[in-house]
Amino acid sequence: MEQSHKTATSQRPEAMKELTRAINDHLAAEFQASHTYLAMSIWLREKDLAGFSTYMLDKSNEERTHASRMIAYLVDSDEQVELPTVEAPERQWPSVQGLFDAVYELEKGVTASINRLYGIAEQQGERSATAMLDWFVAEQLQEEAEARFVCKRLRLAGDNSAALLLLDQQFLEGTALSHVKGGLSGTGSANQA
């Protein structure tokens, strides 16, 4: 029994190193999303779409909060945090529809990265990591549901500027996503999480 305890203890640091590397790599995705969403917020504000702009600014802040959660996990696990370099994001989009199509693709990429982290944590038997990542799995379900919903609404609006302005107003009032369900709780928006 003593021998198996020593083996498990000696393997844990190497297993945790792999997970730590993967989490640090994922931090780049969270910070890049935050930076990209800030650029999107600015672009939308320049187009006088205050509702969409405010929504994307909130999304930018939310992504930094996600990164902070992972940083807290690493610090609490006595692991090294490596802050990533963030590239300058795009600053132009062909349309509001094109912008939200990019949001949806970005969220799908973040989801894939979280799923990769979860797989590593499960493989390494890191229960505290899977517990932390459970929240992210539910959050990403919500994030993708919201992005998909907005893309569908914008497709319905098409070239109708009145419909676009109505949707922008709904974002400004905070009612645009009130019926989007997602996450494990099945309740409204991610801001309630």
What are these regions (language model features)?
Residues 1-193:
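Iron-associated oxidoreductase/ferritin-like identity signal
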